[in-house]
Amino acid sequence: MASLDIHLYVKKDLTYGECVRVAKEKYKIIHRLLYISIIFLFLNYVVDIVCYVKNYNGFSFFCWVFLNLGVIGIIITVIIYYISIPKPDAESEFLNKPDSLNQNVGESQSNEPPKYTSTFMDELDKQD
């Protein structure tokens, strides 16, 4: 059975990109844990039905207690993972950093031709 490793990040000066990367990793783990808890809840309902029919014999009661403790443990682990996600201090530096030359593509929606710098236009005029 795989063990769950909880990594707490103590580093205070994470950049926005590092915070996003860590948050994505933690959200993947949280989603997996929530899927496991859904399976545990489904099994818990099956055991509840069996216990209702058989009036709680020893093994079914043990399974019921084990599944309930499993669901509670998973919920506590999800809360710990959610709390340990680092929050970025300054996201504006990361968001304002130009990633490419086409960063402001959505701003120019008109049919006008692109504006060139004056030096480039001067060179074109000289060639004619």
Swiss-Prot record:
GO terms for cellular component: endoplasmic reticulum; membrane. Keywords: Membrane, Transmembrane, Transmembrane helix. It is found in: Membrane. Residues 99-120 have a biased composition (Polar residues). It is a multi-pass membrane protein. It comes from the Eukaryota. Residues 99-128 are annotated as: Disordered. It comes from Schizosaccharomyces pombe (strain 972 / ATCC 24843). The chain crosses the membrane at residues 33-53, 61-81. This is Putative uncharacterized membrane protein C622.07. The keyword Transmembrane helix applies.
